[in-house]
Amino acid sequence: MARFVMNPVDANLDASIDRFTDALWLEDGLAANTLAAYRRDLTLAARWLADQHQAALLQAQEYQLQAYFAARADTRASSANRRLTVFKRYFRWALREGLITQDPTLKLLPARQPPRVPKTLSEAQVEALLAAPDTDTPLGLRDRTMLELMYASGLRVSELVGLKSIDLGLNEGVLRVLGKGSKERLVPFGELARDWLERWLQDGRAQLLGARQSEALFVTSAGRTPGTAMSRVMFWGLVKRYARQAGIHAPLSPHTLRHAFATHLLNHGADLRAVQLLLGHADISTTTIYTHIARQRLKDLHAQHHPRG
């Protein structure tokens, strides 16, 4: 097996690489850092092919690309798969441009990756996070309601901030949610979330809007266009701020409460397929990742409370 050695990169090694990245910039508007990473991956592969097989990148055969990946077997699966994605895009582009007659990456498969267990919070941590906003103010009331609703329903952040007033069925206790792929689903929420929604609608939203009108359920009070829907970035900033106030120092993500929703349901005996429907997952394998957290919780409880634990 050929041993991979990183040689100095020759920027003029293959003009097709520059043509490809130029096309990506024009057609897809990719960021400069992304284009630089694409160029680096392809140029390193081109150098390796020239050194080991005396072949140009556009002449690469399937077995040669397999050998290239094998030579970098110590690379993490996620990095190898990212690189494979770059190669597949490059050779599809080359085929479309008539530079090659066959795509050598057609049968190359991504490396298997271990499931990434999402970070979540304990039930006590969630309670502390929910209690952090000052609900005596309209902004604090809004924030508490958003946190309560996300934990009660398991919404994605984009779904939460995208809610409109007409999506709320307060009497029925359900939300109409437009999820990934523009798929609509009905999501229930509990009594506590309904109580906070009623308070927000009666006491908070009207104060923030004033004389303005807005379709958004959760509105902002500042910026160039007050009264508009909150952004994902703004909500993420609020989650981090309230986590600090609650003394939570664990790594968080914008979907922390969504992960907690799924994990806590499973911990309390919910059916996996029911959780899949609530989360809006197209494939149950996506939901299965939460069972790893639930099983670990059961192991911890056993170790803590069983006399032979």
Regions found by a protein language model. Give the residues of each.
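Conserved catalytic core of the tyrosine transesterase superfamily
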Residues: 1-309
